[in-house]
């Protein structure tokens, strides 16, 4: 019984620890509609911003209408017919939060799915070579070796931590979005 109550109290406390989006983030999320400006590495200010460590989203932020608007606008941006992508991270649209949208080629219809506070738990040693580009790195496409399978940890909108296995093209997109946007281990 004590474990039960501690669990409930823990969820309440964790759920109650809410920081807010900054006034600048609120402005970026709300301004305009649909497609957002993609921050680019060939712009000095954008590049410096993209290199910052992104902040984890809190349960309080995840439950806001603003979070839903951010997701809708990120999806519109990654699906922009003028510059489509297979993945996008919140920092790429000026929001320093750990949120990515990944096109799931391993699912029927290749839908986009969002992942909150993602992290790569493990990666297979077996790798494949594939072409990659990035919405934030204009006019650069290269071949990169990526693990064939990865295990990703993330928090779904319902607040429990989950793990999933990703394979092939989807795996490559996950690794790129998580590594580039949150670990700052790349050079443009």
Indicate where each model-derived feature is located.
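Bacterial Sec-dependent N-terminal signal peptides
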Residues: 1-23
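Positively charged
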Residues: 17-188
């Amino acid at each position: 019984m004590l474990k039960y109550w501690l669990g409930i109290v823990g969820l309440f406390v964790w759920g109650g620890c809410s920081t807010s989006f900054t006034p600048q983030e609120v402005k970026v999320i709300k301004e305009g509609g649909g497609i957002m400006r993609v921050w680019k590495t060939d712009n000095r200010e954008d590049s410096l911003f993209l290199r910052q460590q992104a902040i984890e989203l809190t349960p309080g932020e995840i439950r806001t209408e603003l979070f839903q608007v951010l997701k809708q606008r990120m999806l519109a941006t990654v699906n922009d017919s003028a510059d489509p992508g297979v993945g996008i991270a919140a920092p790429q649209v000026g929001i320093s939060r750990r949120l990515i949208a990944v096109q799931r080629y391993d699912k029927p219809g290749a839908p986009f799915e969002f992942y909150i506070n993602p992290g790569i738990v493990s990666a297979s040693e077996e790798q494949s070579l594939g072409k990659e580009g990035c919405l934030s790195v204009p006019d650069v496409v290269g071949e990169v070796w990526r693990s064939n399978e990865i295990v990703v940890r993330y928090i779904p909108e319902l607040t429990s931590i989950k793990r999933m296995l990703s394979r092939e093209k989807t795996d490559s997109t996950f690794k790129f979005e998580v590594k580039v946007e949150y670990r700052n281990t790349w050079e443009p």
